[in-house]
Amino acid sequence: PDLVVCLKHPTIESTGALMKHRDVAVILSTGGSGLVRAAYSSGKPAYGVGPGNVPCYVDRSADLGKAAEAVVSSQSFDNATLCCSEQALVLDRPIAQRFLAEMQARGAHVATDAERKRLEAFCNRGGQMNADIVGIDPWRVADQAGFHVPQSTTVLLAFQDGVGRDHPLSIEILCPLLSVHVVDGWEDGCRVAKQMLHFGGLGHTMSVHAMDQEVLDAFFLQKPASRIVANGPSSMGAVGFSTNLVPSFSLGCGPQAGNITSDNISARHLVNIKRVAFPTGDWKERERKAHERAASMTGAGMPRGSMMEGDPGRRGSSGPAPELPAAPALTPRVPGGTTF
């Protein structure tokens, strides 16, 4: 009983009181930045995670059919409500039109300029995502924005010519809607991907589709993301469904984003583990060899306390052993205070 309990009427005040309750040992906070900051300031040990704004770079060397299939599947999974789902397609110019055609063949709708403006006005409210669109079908997003697409539509695509406050669809939007950015080569793709991450997804997740190992390595090494999903669906890959990552919906973003860990946070992070350690092998011989290596590099003798040849504190015994002070007499007691 009581393995899982919930607040009946969650409010900011009740959540804060729960975090500070004397029986709470550790907090796992998954939500907006305000909730995470509240957890960190509660005075209790806390794991917090950050928001995502996931760029998906498609290189000229990519298998376009497989890349399109991965993106559509990822966007269809829970209607792109996971914070690790793709938010922007960053397309290498030589393959941009062909990739969009592959997406259209899988039910994607490329918005016209007029439709894009309607999406910008409807989905972005003062720099924040319109909460009414979270997790709804693409055709419903279009309908509420003021235009029509078939109910079979899998994802909406809308061009953006930059990243930032002046580009309303470059924020995190948790429904099957992707901004589209066309770039000139993988170096330019790196630049735009970094902009996306710094604009709201620092340390979280990104994906890359390429067969060129040099391109993959550049993204693996240069991007400020804790999870980089290669040649697969970002949403399902980052949470460990289609990859070997630890299964989790709470994805740490690391110190760069103010989080204590970049791990996929699991039950293991919530378990207090005690470790018992015994010596392995001849530790004294390992110590001697380590000191010898250090001495060969520095010219110094054996350190004081090593009790090895050359230790300045090592001396022969002289005179009788010192007497130890007598232990104080103990008066036995029994429960209740009786002395006997």
Language-model segments: what does each one mean?
Residues T15-G16, A68, C190:
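Short hydrophobic/charged patches on amphipathic alpha-helices used for structural packing
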Residues P1, A17-V24, L197-G203:
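Short, surface-exposed connector motifs at secondary-structure boundaries
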